[in-house]
UniProtKB/Swiss-Prot annotation:
Localisation per UniProt entry: Secreted
Domain of life: Eukaryota
Signal peptide: 1-20
Assigned protein family: Belongs to the peptidase A1 family.
Record propeptide residues: 21-69
Gene3D superfamilies found in the cross-reference section: Acid Proteases
Organism per entry: Aspergillus niger
GO biological process, one term: proteolysis
GO CC annotation: extracellular region
Name by which UniProt lists this protein: Aspergillopepsin-1
A Pfam family: Asp
Disulfide bonds: C319-C354
Length: 394
């Protein structure tokens, strides 16, 4: 476990700048998310969202969650705090609004290869004149809530912020399920996990980050997601104005293709810290925090009236309830998730019952620290090591 102060980071940054002087093309840049309020008819299937997160990592989706997702028994109309925050990316001749996902390794988007009925409301990927279609290559992704997408693969120009590559694998959707079609705010996904889990067949392709990291001042990106506001991604540098205190670093485990790491314990509310650490993944593409059953149960035991609802497919409670904070211990650093972040959303439009931002990992064997956790932190994803850095947001 290594801790860097802002001063040390500045010295390191100056050292890097000096050593990189002969290579003026190297750079760093910031790209902001934007709010994409969905149309008035859009709804969010909460157990469906939960099921997709479990299936993404090979977990077993409980029958109660499957049934709740299929029946639409916990479907809510997003309010302001549930807007989607997406990132504009130039792909081929198009600008798409993509979900940046550190838990997957594909760059895919809605395309003009889809039937016209499935294109409505979405920006579409159209290959540039210089694009090359990879003959015999394909991709196919499916999730636990029944959603899926598949199609062809191109090599094309992609620009994110100030960096462009003309050799990025772009996965063009030619088939897509209704779950994605209905989400008109979102045009696809840009994966930031390790390239080893890219799903393109017959040969996996590199992620955008792996393709362009040699152009960056440092082979890293940092994430500052925000509660009730668009977040920011910094590529190639660390912005010390976005965090307080010091950044605590820990080794990242990339053996499964994810940004995995080991925690050193946790605490709930004002309680003392447990020394029982757990293995976790830092995932911007998962909304919730998914933990071992004993931790989840311990958390909701401190929430008056909380119960595990078969109908809703997860833990629920009165929306007016004050929830305890949840703290993850990483070395000497304590990453605090405010209780208000864990009060995720009403289980249905106008309901006074809310769905918890912490849910069970269903025996997955590791915990997923998704956006509910990340919105309290400034997180550095450094491919050298690799390693992860955590600090409280400024």
């Amino acid at each position: 476990m290594v801790v860097f102060s802002k001063t040390a980071a500045l010295v390191l940054g100056l050292s890097t700048a000096v050593s990189a002087a002969p290579a003026p093309t190297r750079k760093g840049f910031t790209i902001n998310q934007i709010a994409r309020p969905a149309n008035k008819t859009r709804t969010v299937n909460l157990p469906g969202l939960y099921a997709r997160s479990l299936a993404k990592f090979g977990g077993t989706v409980p029958q109660s969650v499957k049934e709740a997702a299929s029946k639409g028994s916990a479907v809510t109309t997003p309010q302001n705090n549930d807007e989607e925050y997406l990132t504009p990316v130039t792909v081929g001749k198009s600008t798409l609004h993509l979900d940046f996902d550190t838990g997957s390794a594909d760059l895919w988007g809605f395309s003009d290869e889809l039937p016209s009925s499935e294109q409505t409301g979405h920006d579409l990927y159209t290959p540039s004149s210089s694009a090359t279609k990879l003959s015999g290559y394909s991709w196919d992704i499916s999730y636990g809530d029944g959603s899926s997408a598949s199609g062809d693969v191109y090599r094309d120009t992609v620009t994110v912020g100030g960096v462009t590559t003309n050799k990025q694998a772009v996965e063009a959707a030619s088939k897509i399920s209704s779950e994605f079609v209905q989400d008109t705010a979102n045009d696809g996904l840009l994966g930031l996990a390790f390239s080893s889990i890219n799903t393109v067949q017959p040969k996996a392709q590199t992620t955008f980050f792996d393709t362009v990291k040699s152009q960056l001042d440092s082979p890293l990106f940092a994430v500052q997601l925000k509660h009730d506001a668009p977040g920011v991604y910094d590529f190639g540098y660390i912005d010390d104005s976005k965090y307080t205190g010091s950044i605590t670093y820990t080794d990242a485990d990339s053996s499964q293709g994810y940004w995995g790491f080991s925690t050193d314990g946790y605490s709930i509310g004002d309680g003392s810290s447990s020394s029982s650490g757990f293995s976790a993944i830092a995932d911007t593409g998962t909304t919730l925090i998914l933990l071992d059953d004993e931790i989840v149960s311990a958390h909701y035991e401190q929430v008056s009236g909380a119960q595990e609802s078969y109908e809703a497919g997860g833990y629920v409670f009165s929306c007016s309830t004050d929830l305890p904070d949840f703290t993850v211990v990483i070395g000497d650093y304590k990453a605090v998730v405010p209780g208000k972040y864990i009060n995720y959303a009403p289980v249905s439009t106008g309901s006074s019952t809310c769905y918890g931002g912490i849910q069970s990992n269903s025996g997955l064997g590791l915990s997923i620290l998704g956006d509910v956790f990340l919105k309290s932190q400034y997180v550095v994803f450094n491919s050298e090591g690799p390693k992860l850095g955590f600090a409280a947001q400024a």
